Regions:
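Basic, glycine/lysine-rich polyanion-binding surfaces/domains
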Residues: 1-140
Length: 140
């Protein structure tokens, strides 16, 4: 269903993968974040979210190993990238963000707001994906 490289995904890491149908056709690509021992976050393309969610709901019933929760409306995601992105975020975050390797993530605060920061952008520029409560998005 979700094809990822064989390596185990460690807590605090993300991996890029593809969501496939039984014939191997690609439904979407997505990032998978491992947030805890049994806690993962899947971020598909926003324009394809409903298709991906329907796909997972179709295949997950009867499998006690997984619980799917659509949290899309509860969170905002901002790709903060460019030559000054890291320096700007470091002024607002209580940590040295340069220590985060590509595809690393950390739950921390930015300007006092609980966020998930992830070095997972793939626009060609360095930076962070910032995931935070939707109600806090405009203020940040």
């Amino acid at each position: 269903m979700l094809k990822l490289p064989k390596r185990k995904l460690r807590i605090g890491r993300a991996r890029y993968g593809v969501i496939c149908n039984p014939q191997g056709g690609i439904i979407d690509d997505a990032l998978v974040y491992r947030l805890g021992e049994e806690r993962y976050l899947l971020v598909p393309n926003a324009s394809n979210k409903d298709v991906v969610l329907d796909w997972f709901h179709r295949w997950a019933p009867g499998q006690d190993l997984v619980r799917i929760e659509d949290i899309t409306s509860k969170y905002a995601m901002v790709a903060h990238q460019g030559p000054q992105a890291m320096a700007m975020l470091e002024e607002l975050a209580p940590m040295d963000l340069s220590s985060l390797r590509p595809f690393a993530s950390v739950e921390t605060q930015v300007a006092g707001v609980d966020t998930l920061l992830a070095r997972t952008g793939y626009t060609g520029e360095d930076g962070m994906e910032v995931i935070l409560p939707a109600s806090q998005g405009p203020d940040l």
